[in-house]
From Swiss-Prot:
Assembly: Monomer.
Protein name: Shikimate kinase 2
Binding residues for substrate: D34, R58, G79, R139
Transmembrane helix is among the record's keywords: no
GO biological process, one term: aromatic amino acid family biosynthetic process
EC number: 2.7.1.71
Metabolic or biological pathway, per its Swiss-Prot or TrEMBL entry: Metabolic intermediate biosynthesis; chorismate biosynthesis; chorismate from D-erythrose 4-phosphate and phosphoenolpyruvate: step 5/7
Keyword Ribonucleoprotein set for record: no
Residue numbers spanned by region LID domain: 112-126
Binding site for Mg(2+): T16, D32
Keywords (A to Z) from UniProt: Amino-acid biosynthesis, Aromatic amino acid biosynthesis, ATP-binding, Cytoplasm, Kinase, Magnesium, Metal-binding, Nucleotide-binding, Transferase
Written domain comment of the UniProt record: The LID domain closes over the active site upon ATP binding.
Length: 174
């Protein structure tokens, strides 16, 4: 199986952490769309949003998704990538989409423990727990709609990777 694997889910679900280790375990290349975009523009996500608003960032995110999609690649996407209909169809039609699902409390705890998350622009201007709740309520149905595989991401990364690998084996063998 050489299809790209797209990891989707909200901030804090473990897309980058799991993605790097999953790519290593599958002997694949790993790309994080946000990191790729930041390296291409030499700007942080916050700087891109400040300069181009969310609309401009979303357009760049789509271009990044298309640019990094390649066989034998694990791609950690930005949490809002599913907001653009083109991106949802693109991922569904060009690879296997894995939704890393986690409850609000887990996401908030992870985000509070990661100081680099302070560099991310707020989506709602509300306190973190309210923002995570609101954003997840808005996006969960879209994550589920686009996903070929849904994984409980509350476990340790090694367990999440094991579950993804099992689900991939079942997907390929059906």
């Amino acid at each position: 199986m050489t299809q790209p694997l797209f990891l989707i889910g909200p901030r804090g679900c473990g897309k980058t952490t799991v993605g790097m280790a999953l790519a290593d375990s599958l002997n694949r290349r790993f790309v994080d769309t946000d990191q790729w975009l930041q390296s291409q523009l030499n700007m942080t996500v916050a700087e891109i949003v400040e300069r181009e608003e969310w609309t401009g960032f979303r357009a760049r995110e789509t271009a990044a998704l298309e640019a990094v999609t390649a066989p034998s690649t694990v791609i950690a996407t930005g949490g809002g990538i599913i907001l653009t209909e083109f991106n949802r169809h693109f991922m569904q039609n060009n690879g296997i989409v894995v939704y890393l699902c986690a409850p609000v409390s887990v996401l908030v705890n992870r985000l509070q423990a990661a100081p680099e998350e302070d560099l991310r622009p707020t989506l709602t201007g509300k306190p973190l727990s309210e923002e995570v709740q609101e954003v997840l309520e808005e996006r969960d149905a879209l994550y589920r709609e686009v996903a070929h595989i849904i994984i409980d991401a509350t476990n340790e990364p090694s367990q999440v990777i094991s579950e993804i690998r099992s689900a991939l084996a079942q997907t390929i063998n059906c």
